[in-house]
Amino acid sequence: MSTSSAAVNGNHYEQLHQGRTKMYKSKVDVVLGAQWGDEGKGKVVDMLASEVDIVCRCQGGNNAGHTVVANGTEFDFHLLPSGVVNEKCISVIGNGVVIHLPSLFDELLKNQAKGLSHLENRLIISDRAHLVFDFHQHVDGMQEAEKGGKSLGTTKKGIGPAYSSKATRNGIRVGELLGDFNLFSDKFKSIVATHVRLFPSINVDVDAELARYKDYAEKVRPYVKDTICFLHTALRNGKTILVEGANAAMLDIDFGTYPYVTSSNCSIGGVLTGLGLPPQTIGEVIGVVKAYTTRVGDGPFPTEQLNEVGDLLQTRGFEVGVTTKRKRRCGWLDIPLLKYTSLVNGYTCICITKLDILDTMAEIKVAVGYKRSNGEKLDHFPGTIAELGSIEVEYANLPGWQTSTEHIRNFKELPENAQNYVRFLESELSVPVRWVGVGKGRESIINVH
């Protein structure tokens, strides 16, 4: 090859390469739970949604529960992205979400009764999202009951069985419901037969279900689009996009405390696969960290406090699951856990929520290390629940501030010890804290920088 030909080929490569790297005029910012869920992601998304064009859900189903307080009204969302409270924002339910249509329409009706309007013009559902059927929920409950004393603490919303159907390639997607209904009927009968064979005690009235889903098809049709094309077009046109992760990093099926996890990837990888986005579209990755730690259901919890401290956190923090209504288990903030989820997710900044719940404490403990029973320090987060359940926790003791922070709106006006608590977390994680929450509403989020 001549020198001139090589130069032409080199320039051609550079032009194409630059075109690929600069094809998107905007980025996708992501909000992820950094612990076991219930960190306050919905409130953070609600705050940021006022400045973006599109808010997306990428995984999970109505096993998630997000509470948003807007204009004095409290909204509970399970399938809908929290951004729906912003009337200027388009909300997207991506291909990675599994959708129980009866629950979706119940949620739409309940929130419309609270004042949400014109959702048909600003909610888009992926045609590739899989459906959760009632028999999935029945199977979920049966599988949990079979485990007896070793139950996983599932929400029994059918999420795991629906993802199982997806993985075994006999699941049904939203787009198939809207296509030839005879083909949908055949697939539905087939998936029911499979589940009845595996679980003989479940009873499905196939004709009644098909009649119901024929009605749902027309109800959901106006909302359904190819969300992959929609999002890529939006990015090329410079539209700003925010992704609301459901559940949290420690519930991720790969990186969480398996098997006490959910059935989807609720870390950064699930954002890409659940929306059809390439890695170069990702901008800020915001980790939402509760100022202490909670989890719902079973599974190891190194910093859990089964004492008056745990009771105080549970009571002051109103720690009851939005979806399950179960009391949340409570404990101290866990730095090794947060370092691990930061490693997996690559947080570019952090939002600390519910700092005000610690207002009454004279002393606050923070987990700073794990060690084995023989005294050996761990330099990694345990990969098995057996190991995690047997470790000993090393704590740092920080002084409390014992004064209310609830009405403070400027970081420098927080008590010095409260500021020190935030800076301690920032220093330990080497990730900047951008916001601190001291109350329920979006107005209670303090911009640190």
Swiss-Prot record:
IMP binds at D38, E39, G40, K41, N63, A64, G65, H66, T155, R169, N247, T262, R326. Keywords: Cytoplasm, GTP-binding, Ligase, Magnesium, Metal-binding, Nucleotide-binding, Purine biosynthesis. The active site is at D38, H66. GTP binds at residues 37-43, 65-67, 328, 354-356, 437-439. Mg(2+) binds at D38, G65. Pathway: Purine metabolism; AMP biosynthesis via de novo pathway; AMP from IMP: step 1/2. It is found in: Cytoplasm. GO terms for biological process: 'de novo' AMP biosynthetic process; IMP metabolic process. SUPFAM superfamilies: P-loop containing nucleoside triphosphate hydrolases (SSF52540). The keyword Disulfide bond does not apply. Binds 1 Mg(2+) ion per subunit. It comes from the Eukaryota. Pfam families: Adenylsucc_synt. One of its GO terms (molecular function) is adenylosuccinate synthase activity. Its EC number is 6.3.4.4. It catalyses: IMP + L-aspartate + GTP = N(6)-(1,2-dicarboxyethyl)-AMP + GDP + phosphate + 2 H(+). Substrate binds at V322, T323, T324, K325, R326, K327, R328. The keyword GTP-binding applies. InterPro entries: Adenylosuccin_syn_GTP-bd, Adenylosuccin_syn_Lys_AS, Adenylosuccinate_synth_dom1, Adenylosuccinate_synth_dom2, Adenylosuccinate_synth_dom3, Adenylosuccinate_synthetase, P-loop_NTPase. Its cofactor is Mg(2+). Belongs to the adenylosuccinate synthetase family. Homodimer. Plays an important role in the de novo pathway and in the salvage pathway of purine nucleotide biosynthesis. Catalyzes the first committed step in the biosynthesis of AMP from IMP. This is Adenylosuccinate synthetase. It comes from Drosophila willistoni (Fruit fly).
